[in-house]
Amino acid sequence: NSEVGINYFDNTYRFRQDSTFLYFFGIDQPDLAAAIDIETGEEILFGNDVTIDDIIWMGPQPAMKDKGENAGVQIVKPLDALSAYISDAKNIGRKIHFLPPYRYHNKIQLNKLLGADIDRQKELASVEFIKGVVALRELKDSYEVAELDKAANIGYIMHYTAMQMAKTGMVEQELVGLMEGIA
């Protein structure tokens, strides 16, 4: 997923990473893509290191290679290498599996990468891939259950704090700030 502008490019809504991307790679950052080659077993993360302009605003950030390694991905390439990677796979007759996109930016990207008609992408999505993701995500191991419990507890604390702190005349954003501070 990429950031989405509210009224111009650099004034964005709060970023929310795609849940399936988070499930498989655990990296909550915009402008990333990944490929899992089921024939070779390779996992490839596509993303760019921050620029000096980014560092001025955000401070030093881990390199993409380090983020990939933390996610268990050994191969990391710049985002603009994705197009050549997909093109090479298509040229040797490999089937490209993808999940149904729900954001327009991703639909446009799929159109550019695969030539998939935007209006037909839902039906062109890989049923095999969808079923595989569902099979993985429907059963939880003890680690996943512990993470769900932790998230539920944080949500409880956030909402309970908001209820305790709410006062007449208070601006909603003040409560949102308190809740975000807990998260």
PLM feature segments, named:
Residues 1-7, 149-183:
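Active-site cores enriched in adjacent His and Asp/Glu residues with nearby glycine-rich loops
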